[in-house]
Amino acid sequence: MGGSNLHSAWAQLFVRALAQAGVRDLVLCPGSRSTPLAIAAMESEEVRCHSVVDERAAAFFALGQARVTGRPSVFVCTSGTAGAHALPAIIEAHQSFTPLIAITADRPWELADAAAAQTIDQTKLFGDHVRHFAELGLPDPSPLALRAVTRIAAQAVTRALSPTPGAVHINARFRKPLEPVDATGPEPWQAEWEALMRRAGTRVVSARAGVDGRAIEELAARCARAERGLIVCGPAESREDDARARRAVLALSRATGFPVLAEGTSQICFGGLTEGVVMPASFDSFLRAPEFRAANAPDLILELGAPPTSAGYATYIAEHASARRVVVSSHGWNDPTSAAAALVMGEPVEVCEALAARLGGAALSLGRGRRDWAATFARAGEIAAGHAARACAGDELTEGAIARMVASACPAGSLLAIGNSMPVRDLDTYCPPSARALRVLHQRGASGIDGLVSAAAGARVAAAAPVTLLLGDLSLLHDLTGLLLAAKATGDGRAPLVIVVVQNDGGRIFEHLPIARRGAALLERCFTMPQHLDFAPAAAMFGLAYERAGTAGELARALAAGYQRAGATLIEAVVPPHDGAARVARLWSDVRRDVAALGSAPAADGAAADLQTP
C-alpha cells in the first residue's frame, strides 16, 4: 500500500493494547526494523520508554523492573541476532516465574531463506523457555486483523502473568517503508483503527484455584502429630505482600513450635518480628556438622518456595530420606531430589495462613518434645551466629565481613540485590535475620551470574528506592555495560544505587569444590580465571562515583558515602584472592566442634513410628 501509514497505526494499536492490559514499562533497543514500534512507544503517554543500547543488558533491565513491580515489562529489539542476546534473561524469567514480554521485530516472509541481510528464523526463537509465542503478522488493513492486534497484546500480558508467570515472545514483521509517510488522504482502515484506539481493552478474569481444604486438613493433622518438625524457606521472589508472607510463616511457627530455617533470599529473614519463634541464623553452617545431622532427625519438613541453596540442608534431607517432606510451591515441581512425600501446589502464604488458623484453633499442645527440639535448633543457631560474628570482627576485610556489612548498611525499606556464586551463600552464612525490612532480589531461577548490574538498574527505576547490589568481580565483568544503565537509572536523583563488588580476583567458588584438590595451575587456568582487574576506569568511563575499600573501616565509610549520594556508586571491596575457602572451612570446623556437644532432643513417644508414615 504505497503512501499508507498502516505499519505505524498497527504498532500504535499494539502498544496501546499492551498498556490497556497493564504494561507500564517498555525497554527499547536501537534498530531499523523495529522503527514502527519504537515511534509508537516513544509517542505513547501510557508507557514509560527506556532506551538501552545492548540487548542483553536491556532484557535484564526489563527483568529487574518486573521483579519489583510484578507486572510484565516489555523488551523490544530489531531483527537478526539482536533477539538472541535476550535469551539469558528469558531463561531466568522462565525459571523464576517472572513476567516478561519480548517483542522481536522481523523482516517480511519473502526475505526468509534468501540471504537477505539481518534475517534469521525468529519463529519460536526462545524455544520452550517462554510460556507463549505468537506471530503478530504483517500489518493488515482488515477489521479482523486490526482487532487481532489488540487480542494478541492482551494474550501476551495474560500469559506472562497466569496461570504460570514467565516470559512471552511476540514476533512482529514489518515491510518497508518503516517510517511514517505523508498520507495522501483518509485511509480505508482508519475508521476501524480509530474506534479500536478509543475502545477499552478486553477485560481478562483469570481463574484462580484456592487452597485445597482437604490438603490443609491432612497437613494440619500431620503437623499436630509431629514432634520434630521444621519450616524451611528457600528463595522466593519479593512481592508487595512480603510482610504478609512473613506474618504467615511466623504464625505457623508459633502454632506448631517448629523452628524456621529461612534463607536470606526467602523474604522471611528481614523485617519480621520473631518473638516466640525459633529462627536460627547461619543454619547452613550447623547442618554441615555430621554429628548434629545424625542426632537431630526430623519427622516432618514443610519446605516453602524454591529449593534452598544450602548444601548443608541438602545433605540433611538426603540422610533423613524417611522423614516426611512436604513441598509447598506456587509454581513448578520444586523437588530436585525427587524424594518429596507430597507437593502442595498453592501460594505458600495462603497455605501457611490456613494451617496456622486451623492449628491455632485446635489448642495444639507444645509439649516437652517440641520445646526441646526447638531449643536444640535455637542453641545451634546461637553457636553458628557467634562464630560468624567473630569471623567478621576487626578491621580486616573478608568476603564474609563484606556480606555482613552490606546487609547491615542497607537502609530500611530498601532493596538488596544479591549475586550468585559466593555472595548469596555468604549472605546465609554471615548475616543474621533482622527486624529491619529489606526486599531481597536474586537470580536463583537459573542461578546465572550475568545481567546482575542491569537487573539492579531496572529494579532501581521501578522501585524509586535505594538499591544495593552485592556481586563478585567476574559477575561485574559479565555485565560491564550494566554500569551505564546504573548511571542512567539514578539520573532522576530520587534514590541511590550502590554496587559493591567483591574483588577477590576470580571465581573463588571453585576453591570450595573438589576440583580445587587437582592443583592450583589447573584451577586457575580452567576455573577461577583471575583477571587482575581494577574497576576504577570502568566507573569513570560510565560516570559512577568510585570507592576502593581494603579494610572494614574503609568499606563502612564508602557505604555511608554511597547512600548519601543520589546517583550510582561502585565500591570495589578488595580481599586476598585465596582467603575465602580457608576461612569458611575454619568457621564450619568451629561450628561443628561446638554443636556436636549439643546431642539430640529427646524423641517423644510415637515419633519414630511417624518417620515411616508414607
From Swiss-Prot:
Protein name per UniProt: 2-succinyl-5-enolpyruvyl-6-hydroxy-3-cyclohexene-1-carboxylate synthase
Underlying gene: menD
GO terms classed as biological process: menaquinone biosynthetic process
InterPro entries on file: DHS-like_NAD/FAD-binding_dom (IPR029035), MenaQ_synth_MenD (IPR004433), THDP-binding (IPR029061), Thiamin_PyroP_enz_TPP-bd_dom (IPR012001), TPP_enzyme_TPP-bd (IPR011766)
SUBUNIT field: Homodimer.
Reaction(s) this enzyme catalyzes, per UniProt: isochorismate + 2-oxoglutarate + H(+) = 5-enolpyruvoyl-6-hydroxy-2-succinyl-cyclohex-3-ene-1-carboxylate + CO2
GO MF annotation, one: thiamine pyrophosphate binding
Record's cofactor remark: Binds 1 thiamine pyrophosphate per subunit.
Organism: Sorangium cellulosum (strain So ce56)
Signal peptide extent: none
Cofactor: Mg(2+); Mn(2+); thiamine diphosphate
Keywords: Magnesium, Manganese, Menaquinone biosynthesis, Metal-binding, Thiamine pyrophosphate, Transferase
Family named by the database record: Belongs to the TPP enzyme family. MenD subfamily.
